[in-house]
């Protein structure tokens, strides 16, 4: 896959596959606070998906290709997402630029003068 970069100065629509984990939910919340339109899915509900949903973020429980029917500019996925995941396959079919959680985290960290690993 080619390298995908998000322009953090231009909020857009980002979909998170696996949004219910501690790391992905935190990244989703950061982008949401920066004015991005955030949505995502997870295999099961969690305190994190409930918290994001309470903020008005669209959360899908279950990962189905139909979840990507609304316009999305970027997809972020976790290492837990397999290449045969229906959403992963649909994002590729639609040509949506995709980046891993680690790639997004690295890009975000470059926006700050100091960071803690």
Predicted regions, residues:
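Phosphate-binding P-loop
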Residues: 107-113
């Amino acid at each position: 896959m080619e390298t995908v970069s998000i322009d953090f100065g231009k909020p857009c629509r980002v979909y998170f596959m696996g949004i219910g984990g501690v790391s992905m939910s935190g990244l989703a919340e950061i982008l949401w606070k920066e004015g991005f339109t955030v949505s995502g899915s997870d295999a099961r509900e969690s305190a994190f998906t409930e918290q994001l949903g309470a903020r008005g973020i669209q959360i899908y429980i279950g990962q189905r290709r139909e979840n990507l029917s609304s316009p999305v500019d970027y997809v972020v996925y976790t290492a837990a997402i397999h290449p045969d995941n229906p959403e992963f396959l649909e994002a590729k079919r639609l040509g949506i630029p995709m980046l891993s959680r680690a790639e997004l985290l690295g890009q975000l960290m470059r926006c700050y003068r100091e960071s803690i690993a």
